[in-house]
Amino acid sequence: MVLNPSKYQDTRTWKMTPAMIRARKPFFKGNMLGLTLLLGVTGSVYYYTYHFLHKDNDFADVPIPPIDPQELEALKKEYEAKKKA
């Protein structure tokens, strides 16, 4: 498939013509502002999500009641019995 030459591109080098560059010039700042805003919002969402999900949440503030050694042995035996079955 052969590309049809555009009147806004030089047919030999495929670069934009000066007319096309002049036509795009007024929109450059707005486009860059929009791009910056879009990337900023996207980056902020990813940053917030990453740091929110990677918090150290190891339940350190939950007190663990002490366990009696006899209860611990009974629980170990129960665990081993379930493991074998």
Swiss-Prot record:
GO cellular component annotations of the record: mitochondrial inner membrane; mitochondrion
Ranges per topology, Mitochondrial matrix: 1-26
Keyword Coiled coil: no
InterPro entries linked to this entry: Coa3 (IPR041752)
Subcellular location: Mitochondrion inner membrane
Entry keyword set: Membrane, Mitochondrion, Mitochondrion inner membrane, Transmembrane, Transmembrane helix
GO BP term, pick one: protein stabilization
Residue ranges annotated as Mitochondrial intermembrane topological domain: 50-85
Transmembrane domains' residue ranges: 27-49
Membrane topology: Single-pass membrane protein
Remaining remarks: Present with 2530 molecules/cell in log phase SD medium.
Family affiliation: Belongs to the COA3 family.
Record note on quaternary structure: Component of 250-400 kDa complexes called cytochrome oxidase assembly intermediates or COA complexes composed at least COA3, COX14, COX5A, SHY1 and SSC1. Interacts with COX1 and MSS51.
Function: Required for assembly of cytochrome c oxidase (complex IV). With COX14, negatively regulates COX1 translation and is involved in MSS51 association with newly synthesized COX1.
Protein name per its UniProtKB record: Cytochrome c oxidase assembly factor 3, mitochondrial
